[in-house]
């Protein structure tokens, strides 16, 4: 078989092979080949090698896949086994958890039961503690009572102990003798009769003592009689028991023992009754002590009242204190004011008023003063009479001596002294303003009022305090306030006096002049009319009777009246 192969021109040009230029190809005719030749020719190419290589690569891949699959299967088997183990462990853990939960619930239930039991036990414990305390307290009280009863029994059964010891000795002797022989019934009856006689004698003695104590304390007699009756009944019972025991001649020792027991019971009953009587006597003694304390308290209260009454009736401080105070203030006031003291006639009138303390004294004094002051000029008759009456009342009140001055009136007297000092200061200002120079002017009523005020201030200083009563306190306080207001009015009066116009006469001036000494004002008026105004200050100094001249008085030589301009400026 011929096969034609097609070759490219570029590939075979160098070999000198004919080419078909039109087509660019060359046709090569191959001879037929055998199988061997084909094999040789086939070996020249790489087709077989490529196939082999491809086959080998596929084989290698298959082998690798097989190997990897085997490994994966082994790994999977291992993992499956591990997972199965884990699953088994998980199942076991789940079962364990279920068991633990069940146990936990059981434990919780047990815990709740235990807590409830604990609370119950604690409550029982606390209640038992309280009960134990109460029982201990009761036991202590009972022990105390038993000890007290034992002490009382020991104190009261001292004479009975000897008798009991004798009876015990006899009982022991009889108990030892009963083994050898039996005692005679007659002897036993004689012994029991002697014991009964002794007990009767003791009861009679006790009853006699109770009767004597009942006479002393009749309140306890009834209690003692009741106790005596109870003791007699106990004694009768003892006698009956003794007779019954005597009838039993076989058991002599037992009879003696029963006698002792009965005697002890009797002593115990007697002690209880005696303790009751003692308690009653203690209550009575307490009542007596309380009554005595009340009586003492009443006595002390009465003594305090009596002492207060005595203090109220004690004499008050003497008049020397007041007499020593008022002259000192009087002297200081004279140093400041340098005005004349009251005249001798005024002192005489004061002495007369001291002697006359009754209603007749006041009436006569009013008549005398009205007779002395009839020469006043410039005032109407009705106003003169009112002023004279008030002046007389004022002099009478200031001229009287101090009677018994109580301690609660000292404050009022101190208030008076303060008022007098204020009046002194007002009077000093009044003198500086030159009132004495204008006393001889046409205004007689105003001069009288000014002189009257000056004299009133001296009179208030020189007068002695009057007896003050408690119901006059409020009136005096009112007077003090009014006097302070009047002092301010007195300071303002000089300006009214210096005015050129003649002011009309008012009732206020009369009321202000009603509280002063009118007799002294009359004397000052007469002296001022007789002598000029320049020598008034020297005359005021000379009128002091029985007083030496002082240096303070010599310094003041003249006084100049301030001008109207200075007055208008408000300096005065």
UniProtKB/Swiss-Prot annotation:
Alphabetic keyword roster: Chromosome partition, Coiled coil
Entry superkingdom: Eukaryota
Coiled coil: 59-110
GO terms for biological process, alphabetical: maintenance of meiotic sister chromatid cohesion; meiotic sister chromatid segregation
Region annotation Disordered: where it falls in the sequence: 185-221, 244-285, 333-352, 484-572
InterPro entries assigned: SGO_plant, Shugoshin_C
Biased composition (Polar residues): 192-201
GO (cellular component) term, any one: nucleus
Biased composition (Basic and acidic residues): 244-257, 336-352, 523-542, 552-572
Functional description taken from the UniProt entry: Protects sister chromatid centromere cohesion in meiosis I but not through the protection of the cohesin SYN1. Required with SGO2 for full protection of centromeric cohesion during anaphase I. Required to prevent precocious release of pericentromeric cohesins during meiosis. Not necessary for the maintenance of the synaptonemal complex (SC). Not required for monopolar spindle orientation in meiosis I.
Family of this protein: Belongs to the shugoshin family.
Additional record remark: Knock-down mutants show meiotic defects, reduction in seed set and fertility, and premature separation of sister chromatids before meiosis II, but no defects in vegetative development or growth. The localization of SYN1 and ZYP1 are not affected. Sgo1 and sgo2 double mutants are almost completely sterile and show a premature separation of sister chromatids at anaphase I.
Protein name: SHUGOSHIN 1
Organism per entry: Arabidopsis thaliana (Mouse-ear cress)
